[in-house]
């Protein structure tokens, strides 16, 4: 998308570095937001979106390719690599965008995640994806690199995340030492 500055494009690295230096020069911290839209990918006749389960996106009605274990590992690694690149650019941390039906929230939601493997089922299973991302970022970027999480507190759909589940989910995720949360 031409209006989004992507950290995975090496051509953008210098711009991210200049931005971080300009902000941090004023004794403030620069936090980059990273995300994957999952099944919300804009429709493309050649490339199917990937998703947690074979459930259509509520807006495009496209049915995603269900992610395999190797797809999941590859995307976890992409999140970790993006965080590491932002750290090298001078950012103080990242916020994982798990709101608005993006991939992280697709994993966490009982409405969109009907998997019967280790990434589905109960709260522990549905938070496994984001917990693996956080653990990977901590391992690569260290304990002082800020890791935040934006996630839904109430999806307002039948069978979706409700406030009580959001609290249980946050307790499970907090064991990974998330520095900030925005619901």
Which sequence ranges carry the predicted segments?
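Flavin-dependent oxidoreductase catalytic cores
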Residues: 1-183
């Amino acid at each position: 998308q031409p209006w989004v500055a992507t950290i995975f494009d090496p051509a953008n690295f210098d711009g991210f570095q200049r931005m971080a230096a300009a902000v941090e020069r004023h004794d403030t911290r620069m936090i980059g937001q990273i995300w994957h839209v999952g099944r919300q990918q804009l429709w493309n006749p050649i490339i199917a979106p990937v998703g947690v389960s074979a459930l259509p996106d509520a807006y495009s009605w496209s049915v995603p390719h269900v992610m395999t274990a190797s797809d999941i590992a590859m995307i976890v690694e992409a999140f970790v690599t993006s965080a590491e690149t932002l750290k090298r650019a001078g950012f103080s941390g990242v916020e994982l965008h798990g709101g608005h039906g993006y991939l992280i929230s697709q994993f966490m939601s009982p409405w969109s995640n009907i998997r019967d493997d280790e990434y589905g089922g109960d709260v522990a299973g549905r938070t496994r994806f984001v917990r693996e991302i956080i653990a990977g970022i901590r391992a690569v970027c260290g304990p002082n690199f800020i890791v935040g999480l934006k996630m839904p507190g109430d999806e307002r759909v039948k069978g979706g995340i409700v406030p009580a589940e959001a609290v249980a989910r946050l307790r499970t995720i907090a064991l990974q030492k998330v520095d900030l949360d925005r619901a």
